[in-house]
Amino acid sequence: MPRNDSFQRRAFPGGASSLQERPARSVAEMKKQQASKIREIGTALIASGFHALDAQADVLELSRTTTWTIIKSKHKSSGLSVGTLNRMLSARRLPPIVRAKIHEYIRQKAAGLYGDSEKRIRKIAALQSRTSQG
């Protein structure tokens, strides 16, 4: 399958297509930045008045286990899945500040800032185009 060069230029400035070709930022630094951004989602929930895990899970429309994983930054190193992000964004009572943090995370992940593969970036970019804030 041919490489989509316009995607490459947007996702990886300079046309880098793999972790080996990307700038000197280490994978560990990228994952640390990703974990920090995910923690901001939890902080936004607390700032919106959702202190208890049950309340947080309810407003995100996720299971308690998934919510705990997000809040405590115990997620796998690949970050939040497109499915989880979709469920959170479709939550009817999601506070605007939390929604904004999720969109920030999606934008940064789609830009390749967290060291994801091209395939994962394409998936997140598709989610971004479907759910972009106006």
Predicted feature locations:
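Short alpha-helical "recognition helix" segments of helix-turn-helix
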Residues: 56-57
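Helix-turn-helix DNA-binding elements, focusing on the entry/boundary residues of the two helices
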Residues: 52-53
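N-terminal acidic-hydrophobic amphipathic loop/helix motif that frequently occurs adjacent to catalytic
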Residues: 13-14, 18-30, 98-109
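A short, Lys/Arg-rich alpha-helix, primarily the initiator
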Residues: 18-49
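Glycine- and charge-rich intrinsically disordered segments
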Residues: 1-25, 126, 132-134
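Recognition helix of helix-turn-helix/homeodomain-like DNA-binding domains
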Residues: 61-79
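DNA major-groove recognition helix of helix-turn-helix/homeodomain DNA-binding modules
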Residues: 79-104
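Helix-turn-helix/homeodomain-like alpha-helical modules used for DNA recognition
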Residues: 97-134
